[in-house]
């Protein structure tokens, strides 16, 4: 029973992916049917200076809402790549229905799935995943004469490549020219430093290949497609100060999404057979007599596609969306800013083929520390939310890791945002009673504004935080604050032993514990590859028609159980460069 919602337009709100405002929708009913869903606020801004409307949210507006209206059901699947926004929209719809005479449970009408099987034959290359590495593979193979079919599980292409600032490139020609013709680094010195940082655990021939080829990728994308790179290069955390990465976008003020979409549109013109589909998730590799001959995938509507190709490029972005794999290889299930449709398909399939892992346990890509549960509710002020965030980032207080050990978030000078992963999935800031009272009476020791997920609150240093009790109550409501009477009490509430005898000298009195977390983009380890980007098997041989690119093979550039290299943009640079090289080699072997 759906109940009966009177004709009219109703508005509703719910927290979504953004950190500034809740999603707000206007939903129109006629004859107890949803006839329109309009966006009032997309709720997508992940930073105080971002637009609330994002390209990820656009996939919800363009795909989810029409499907709900067509099916008159809330059982429509969430949009892959926009799950949080999809679920927020469904929450709003349920609340609107229930608040206006309807019964949202009655709207859970099963949506029939297709049983069709589509076979696509005679492709030279099938690309699984159309983030940076997959798009680069597609472009490179297509421009060199291959017929190419690509598939992307999400509803849009570009993946994390549309969310990151930019890639690493060693001495790219245009930027060197803008630098007066002077190289930014000596390649041999960079190679030596790279291998020293990785304690010789990275694969030397791949590191050298990346150093030699990454700069060329900038020119390739800028000269042939709608990508634009700043003329300046930048340094990152590395102590040498080498300028090895830059920011990129679409040309003529376009976005990264514009650049990826335009590039793929151009690649489709290279021959009439080239094609790609979004919302198409690979489920297995097709094999005949032990040889890989293509990919089987399922579309959002249930249609099964069997794509037969001479070679396959596995470009599906690592395994950050696979809890079992992240627990096995990195020790935790992580909070993410990156795309969680990256579920380890490529790596799992490589292992079934007898592929060799290479540093699958490289640390996750972490540049963000924040509250465990970022407070997205409009019921609280951004000032209060920002004050609590400042405290969870404050190195002046005692911190412990996920095992209850004392944790120094800046032990190496790189800062908490870079080091938070070393605490495990969570870290905790412990404030003793004296410190707490000082904040109320004298203000914060320091006001910490995060690089990401900043909510734009205002605070004047030295101002007493007289409403600190209210801020702590807000944190408690979202599971971010635990108030304990003692270390023993805190240990019981957290469910772990705490290896401290005091909190900054306090042995008695309340402890105010704020729960923080690393927010990560992706995993950084995976399979072994050779210099042709081919999968290396356990016996040391290579599989010449299986290419493994991007995060799926990023472990070859990094060290086991260590943060990935400190030069900036390494993951993005590898994605674009490994894809370019894979497409080029695939064309040499399989075109025509």
Where do the model's predicted regions map?
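Active-site- and interface-proximal helix/loop "cap" or "latch" segments in soluble metabolic
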Residues: 2-108
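N-terminal Rossmann-like FAD-binding beta1-loop-alpha1 element of flavoenzymes
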Residues: 120-150, 587
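Conserved redox-cofactor binding core of oxidoreductases
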Residues: 211-303, 322-324, 370, 502-507
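Core beta-strand elements of the Rossmann-like FAD/NAD(P) dinucleotide-binding domain
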Residues: 120-123, 301-311, 542-543
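Glycine-rich FAD pyrophosphate-binding loop
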Residues: 143-163
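Glycine-rich loop(s) and the adjacent beta-strand/alpha-helix scaffold that form part
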Residues: 302-373, 572-581
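An anion/pyrophosphate-binding glycine-rich loop and adjacent beta-alpha core
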Residues: 347-349, 356-489
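A glycine-rich dinucleotide-binding beta-alpha-beta segment and adjacent secondary-structure elements
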Residues: 42, 284-286, 483-560
């Amino acid at each position: 029973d759906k109940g009966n919602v009177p004709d009219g337009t109703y508005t509703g709100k719910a927290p979504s992916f953004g950190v500034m405002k809740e999603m707000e929708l206007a939903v129109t009913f006629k004859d107890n049917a949803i006839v329109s869903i309009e966006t009032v606020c997309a709720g997508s801004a992940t930073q105080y200076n971002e637009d609330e409307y994002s390209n990820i949210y656009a996939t919800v507006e363009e795909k989810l809402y029409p499907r709900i209206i067509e099916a008159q059901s809330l059982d429509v699947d969430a949009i892959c790549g926009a799950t949080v926004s999809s679920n927020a929209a469904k929450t709003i719809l349920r609340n609107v229905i229930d608040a206006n005479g309807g019964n949202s449970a009655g709207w859970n009408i099963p949506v029939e799935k297709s049983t069709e099987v589509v076979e696509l034959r005679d492709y030279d290359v099938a690309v699984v995943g159309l983030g940076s590495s997959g798009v680069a593979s597609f472009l490179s193979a297509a421009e060199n004469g291959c017929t190419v079919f690509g598939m992307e599980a999400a509803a849009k292409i570009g993946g994390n490549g549309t969310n990151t600032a930019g890639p690493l490139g060693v001495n790219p020609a245009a930027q060197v020219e803008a630098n007066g013709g002077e190289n930014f680094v000596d390649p041999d010195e960079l190679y030596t430093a790279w291998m020293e940082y990785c304690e010789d655990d990275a694969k030397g021939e791949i590191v050298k290949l990346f150093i030699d080829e990454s700069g060329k990728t900038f020119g390739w994308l800028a000269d042939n497609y709608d990508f634009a790179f700043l003329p300046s290069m930048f340094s990152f955390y590395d102590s040498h100060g080498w300028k090895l990465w830059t920011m990129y976008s679409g040309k003529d003020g376009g976005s990264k999404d514009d650049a990826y979409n335009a590039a793929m549109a151009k690649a489709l013109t290279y021959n009439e057979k080239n094609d790609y589909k979004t919302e198409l998730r690979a489920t297995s590799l097709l094999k005949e007599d032990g040889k890989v001959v293509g990919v089987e995938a399922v579309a959002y509507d249930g249609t099964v596609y069997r794509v037969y190709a001479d070679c396959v490029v596995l470009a599906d972005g690592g395994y950050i969306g696979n809890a079992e794999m992240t627990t096995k290889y990195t020790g935790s299930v992580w909070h993410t800013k990156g795309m969680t449709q990256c579920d380890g398909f490529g790596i799992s399939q490589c292992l079934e083929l007898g592929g060799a892992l290479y540093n699958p346990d490289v640390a996750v890509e972490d540049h963000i520390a924040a509250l465990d549960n970022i407070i997205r509710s409009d019921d609280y002020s951004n000032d209060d939310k920002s004050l609590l965030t400042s405290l969870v980032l404050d190195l002046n207080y005692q911190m412990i890791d996920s095992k209850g050990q004392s944790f120094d978030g800046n032990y190496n000078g790189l800062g908490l945002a870079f080091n938070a992963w070393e605490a495990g999935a969570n870290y905790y800031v412990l404030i003793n009673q004296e410190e707490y009272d000082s904040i109320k009476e004298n203000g914060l020791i320091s006001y910490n504004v995060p690089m990401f997920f900043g909510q734009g609150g205002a605070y004047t240093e030295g101002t007493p935080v007289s409403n600190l009790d209210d801020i702590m109550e807000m944190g408690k409501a979202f599971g971010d604050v635990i108030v304990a009477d003692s270390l023993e009490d805190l240990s019981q509430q957290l469910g772990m032993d705490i290896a401290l005898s005091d909190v900054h000298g306090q042995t008695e009195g309340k402890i105010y514990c704020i729960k923080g977390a690393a927010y990560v983009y992706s995993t950084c380890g995976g399979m072994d590859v050779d210099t042709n980007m081919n999968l290396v098997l356990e016996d040391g041989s290579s599989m010449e028609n299986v290419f493994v690119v991007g995060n799926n093979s990023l472990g070859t550039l990094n060290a086991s159980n260590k943060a990935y290299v400190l030069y900036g943009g390494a993951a993005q640079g590898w994605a674009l460069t490994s894809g370019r090289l894979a497409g080029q080699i695939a064309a040499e072997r399989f075109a025509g």
